[in-house]
Design a protein with these regions (language model features):
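Ser/Thr-glycine-rich phosphate-binding loops at phosphate-binding pockets of nucleotides
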Residues: 31, 147-155
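Active-site-adjacent structural elements in enzyme catalytic cores
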Residues: 62-65, 117, 134, 153
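Residue-level signal for inorganic ion chemistry
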Residues: 64, 85, 156, 233, ...
Length: 288
């Protein structure tokens, strides 16, 4: 297990800003890109990127990658998301009927992206892991949904209304979790843009809110390599079995977080071909 707190203690603020993540609580109004760009400008960074688009009116957890951590974006995008929201039914139905139909939208479902989405409009399979009613007030329903990354909640509500035969649309939506990033995380709760502006010139406070990019080790299992092979592997060469600090057993195509002690090397993909254990997907060069 990699001790993220220990790694963070050793880093300078420059190193954290070069390879870190901030868990932003997105407000209603701006686009996800605008939020990301705002963070870039006020922190004086070269670039930023976000881990999964939220519509302008949607609020909540929007992790923002800083500088070199932007290369990690693709590794986080597919992680599960969790939302709370309010839907409006166009006609009243009993709670029993609503719960019954909601069960039809739990598990593997087929979804066609909305007309205004940026992806190609072709039917895709997604998994809804939990879809439940929290509270009802006439035709307005407070709900919670835990879904696979890439699931469109607005479309989920629309399709639910169609299946009910009365129609439905989403009134409000808030993302409360994006993979390992949560709004109420004990160490790294989401912070507002206003709070970020307040701490941006206070190094001690800024350090508190930046999550080291090494947090990727909580997504992909950790593999330790021998210290003497680290420099060669940092140059983009593959990992051979002889470079491993111990024996590992992973399926081919699995992704791994590679470390030499507590030094992050990168994200690699298992191939197990002719003594080659894994090939690089992302390598973190030393930060000078």
């Amino acid at each position: 297990m990699i001790d993220i707190d220990k790694i963070k203690e050793k880093k300078t603020i420059k190193e954290l800003l070069e390879f870190g993540i901030i868990n932003i609580d997105k407000p209603s109004g701006p686009t996800s890109f605008e939020v990301s760009d705002f963070v870039r400008k006020i922190l004086g960074l070269r670039k930023t990127s976000h881990f999964g688009t939220l519509d302008p009116k949607v609020t909540g957890v929007l992790p923002i990658a800083l500088n070199r951590a932007c290369k990690l974006t693709g590794f986080f995008l597919g992680e599960d998301k969790e939302y709370v929201g309010i839907m409006s039914l166009h006609e009243k139905v009993s709670q029993e009927e609503l719960e019954r139909i909601m069960k039809d939208f739990t598990g593997k479902i087929k979804q066609l992206p909305p007309v205004r989405s940026r992806v190609k409009r072709q039917e895709r399979e997604r998994e809804v892991k939990n879809f439940e009613i929290l509270e009802t007030d006439g035709k307005e329903i407070l709900f919670r949904a835990e879904v696979q990354g890439g699931t469109y909640i607005r479309k989920l509500i629309h399709d639910l209304g169609e299946k009910l035969g009365v129609g439905a649309h989403m009134l409000e939506l808030r993302r409360i979790r994006a993979g390992i990033f949560k709004e109420d995380n004990e160490k790294y709760p989401s912070i507002s843009l206003y709070e970020l502006e307040k701490v941006m010139k206070d190094e001690k406070m800024l350090r508190k809110i930046i999550i080291p990019g090494e947090i990727i080790s909580q997504i992909y299992p950790v593999v330790q390599i021998n210290e003497e092979s680290a420099e060669r592997i940092l140059r983009g060469q593959p990992i051979y079995e002889k470079n491993l600090a111990e024996k590992y057993n992973f399926n081919v195509e699995n992704k791994i977080s590679v470390f030499s002690e507590d030094r992050f090397i990168g994200v690699f993909r298992i191939i197990n071909e002719r003594e080659v254990f894994a090939k690089p997907e992302f390598v973190l060069q030393p930060i000078s």
